[in-house]
Amino acid sequence: CTHQQINNCYFTEVGNEDWGCLAIAAGYVSDINIEHNEISEVPYSGISLGWGWTQTVNCMRNNRVHANLIHHYAKHMYDVAGIYTLGSQPKSYVTENCVHSIYKPGYVHDPNHWFYLYTDEGSSFITVRDNWTEGEKYLQNANGPGNVWENNGPKVDSVIRERAGLEAGYKDLLNIQ
């Protein structure tokens, strides 16, 4: 997929029957823009961007995850993050998102293996900047070159937290039952 937009959507209570589902999963993509979404009450991670556990440059590039609000995630699974990346993605950005309130189910195999932001194997050439998280629990696992991590955590300007999620014209989605 190329040049796709996932903007101003509300994802909640997805994956109730298949706990391995994500709210947004974008595998081998380029020029995708995922912004101003709200994700809550999901069994696993909120957003997964990329695929292929390799540092080899491929079709994935120019991707953007921006100003999303992700909360109350990982209801049933661990090895998770609010935002998770995998594989080489030159000129890709994870910026100005707000991630908080992870569930802590007692039956997961490793109760400490959860993160707010997680760049997994082969994640390369990705900038992770200005994301508000309620703590500084991140994982950079077997990453490749060129990643930039700047100004993430609870000390990020509160304006970023307030602007994340649905834009004003889409807030009525929160009232749909």
Question: Which residues make up each language-model segment?
Answer:
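Active-site beta-loop-alpha junctions enriched in small/polar residues
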Residues: 52, 88, 120-122
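Short, small-residue-enriched loops and turns at beta-alpha junctions
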Residues: 54-56
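N-terminal short leaders/motifs
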Residues: 82-85, 90
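Short glycine/acidic-rich loop motifs that flank beta-strands on beta-rich extracellular proteins
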Residues: 15-22, 43-49, 58, 70, ...
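Extracellular beta-rich repeat passengers
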Residues: 96, 107-177
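Right-handed parallel beta-helix
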Residues: 2-15, 30-44, 59-74, 90-105, ...
